[in-house]
Design a protein with these regions (language model features):
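A conserved acidic beta->alpha catalytic loop
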Residues: 15, 49-63, 118
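Short loop->beta transition adjacent to catalytic acidic/histidine clusters or analogous donor-positioning motifs
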Residues: 4-5, 37-47, 76-78
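Short, acidic, metal-binding catalytic loop of nucleotide-sugar glycosyltransferases
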Residues: 23-43
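Short beta-strand-to-loop acidic/aromatic patch adjacent to the donor-nucleotide binding site
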Residues: 107-118
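Active-site-proximal specificity loops/subdomain of glycosyltransferases
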Residues: 55-107
Length: 180
């Protein structure tokens, strides 16, 4: 059986002119690049974290379309997670809610990220899993933000004094050690 990876993604159509799934950044950027770079030797569940009143993502017809689109790809599925009770914009609480659900669902690894990520490197999932396994599944890893290299000051790059790893890939041990 494939190792199961939970991908935790808050998203919103608030203040955006989207009316369909295919209008969204999640479809146009995230999914299109993910599908070109993911490792089909793993199984994935996207945990899409949405507001109950979101004009696009809470629409049941659009939700069905999103699930159908994702499910047509090898080893991919998707669940919607409600932000009910979480103050608007509190992304860490959103990630934590999805992390807990993914943990309960049996995911071995978790990737917290935004809906606007563009993946460029094939094999990034396998590299992330292997990096964690080398350290008994303790630690944090994930893909590099190439924009930092093109546009960034060296202090914001990996190893730099002000580097912040915002897209984190962790194992179940992270939850066992730190909780949500």
């Amino acid at each position: 059986m494939c190792e199961l990876i939970g991908i935790l993604i808050p998203t919103t159509s608030f203040k955006r002119k989207w009316t369909t799934f295919k209008d969204t950044i999640f479809y146009q950027i995230y999914l299109q690049s993910f599908l070109k770079t993911y490792c089909s030797n793993y199984s994935y569940v996207f945990y899409l974290i949405v507001d109950d009143d979101d004009k696009v993502f809470s629409d049941s017809i659009i939700q069905t379309e999103i699930i159908k689109y994702v499910n047509q790809n090898k080893n991919l599925s998707l669940k919607f997670i409600s932000t009910n009770g979480i103050p608007k914009g509190w992304v860490t609480k959103m990630w934590n809610r999805a992390f807990l659900q993914a943990y309960k669902d049996g995911c071995q690894y978790f990737f917290q990220c935004g809906d606007d990520i563009m993946f460029e490197t094939k094999g990034w999932v396998h590299q992330s899993v292997e990096a964690l396994k080398k350290h008994n599944n303790v630690g944090l890893t994930g893909p590099i933000d190439n924009g930092r290299f093109v546009n960034g000051n060296p202090i914001f790059m990996p190893g730099g004094a002000r580097f912040i790893h915002t897209q984190a890939f962790v194992s179940r041990k992270h939850m066992e050690i730190f909780g949500t």
